[in-house]
């Protein structure tokens, strides 16, 4: 992996994570010290999502935006990956010069749904919450990599 494909572990500051789904987009943010990840909002894909995400980026002023990329268990990109990559390109144009990075989002939605179920919340009635929790899971993984100085799951920039 070339250095341009890795999250910049030297940058302090807020990071945003996006879990782009067919109907909803979960958004999460970190604190400036890259310690905590927390849910921000669920954006509906029918409601001009790139514009709303650009507004969130302007509000949080992140050092980078991390987008989850749908990857199958065998490591190949899922069918939805091209749609997510297209959305990532649009977002990159809207928020330039803030970089957009890709991260393998394997199992994040299932992990989020399971965690909500274990917390006693009905996942079917909380779909927007699941999307936010999936974005939090993506971001927590990246923050752990930043703390460890690693970035094995990054899969390239938005132009990949």
Swiss-Prot record:
Keywords: Cytoplasm, Hydrolase, Nuclease, Ribosome biogenesis. It is found in: Cytoplasm. GO terms for molecular function: nuclease activity. It comes from the Bacteria. It holds the Pfam family RuvX. Its main location: cytoplasm. SUPFAM superfamilies: Ribonuclease H-like. Gene3D superfamilies: YqgF/RNase H-like domain (3.30.420.140). It is an enzyme of class 3 (hydrolase). One of its GO terms (biological process) is rRNA 5'-end processing. Its EC number is 3.1.-.-. SMART domains: YqgFc. One of its GO terms (cellular component) is cytosol. Belongs to the YqgF nuclease family. Could be a nuclease involved in processing of the 5'-end of pre-16S rRNA. This is Putative pre-16S rRNA nuclease.
């Amino acid at each position: 992996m070339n250095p341009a494909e890795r999250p910049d572990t030297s940058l302090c500051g807020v990071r945003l994570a996006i879990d782009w789904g067919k109907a909803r987009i979960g958004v999460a943010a970190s604190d400036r010290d890259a310690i905590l990840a927390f849910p921000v909002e669920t954006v509906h894909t029918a409601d001009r999502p790139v514009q709303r995400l650009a507004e969130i980026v302007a509000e949080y002023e992140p050092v980078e935006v991390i987008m989850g990329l749908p990857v199958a268990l065998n490591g190949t990109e899922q069918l939805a990956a091209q749609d997510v990559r297209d959305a990532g390109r649009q977002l990159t144009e809207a928020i330039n010069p803030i970089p957009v990075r890709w991260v393998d989002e394997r199992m994040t939605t299932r992990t989020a749904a399971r965690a909500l179920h274990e917390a006693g919340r009905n996942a079917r009635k909380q779909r927007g919450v699941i999307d936010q929790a999936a974005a939090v899971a993506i971001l927590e993984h990246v923050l752990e990599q930043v703390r460890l100085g690693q970035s094995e799951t990054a899969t390239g920039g938005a132009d990949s």
